Amino acid sequence: MRKVLFSIQYEILSEKRNEYLSVVKELKNLLKADGLESYAVYEIKGKNNSFEEIYTFSSPEAFENFDDDQNERLNILINKLNDLTTENSTKYTTLYELTEV
């Protein structure tokens, strides 16, 4: 079965960096869903306060069902992350693994 990578790239307000790091730490501890193989956050080299979250799902079905599995605390943290980002900086990418190569 082919995997799915979902990424969210954004910039945060520089004065909110410490708050951002604590929210992401809690989010990493709470993110557990069927079919979610991994979740990682990276800082983009050469771009201060620019980050990318990468979710790896075991299948397209697991990716499609991901929103259904979220609890209230996760939703609060995700909304808080949205409040910390700079306006118009968020970019979403979804990649489907090629299994025939």
Annotate each language-model stretch with its function.
Residues Y92-V101:
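Short, low-order "capping/linker" segments at domain edges
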Residues V4-Y10, E52:
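Active-site-flanking beta-strand signature of metal-NTP-handling nucleotidyl enzymes
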Residues L13-E15, G46, S58-P60:
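Short coil/turn motifs at secondary-structure junctions
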Residues L30-S38, T56-Y92:
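An amphipathic, aromatic/His-enriched active-site/gating alpha helix that lines ligand/cofactor pockets
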Residues M1-V4, E100-V101:
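Short, Lys/Arg-enriched, disordered terminal segments
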Residues E11-S22:
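Short, surface-exposed ligand-recognition loops at beta-strand->loop->(often short) alpha-helix junctions
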Residues K28-E52:
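Short, glycine- and small/hydrophobic-rich beta-strand elements in well-ordered beta-sheets
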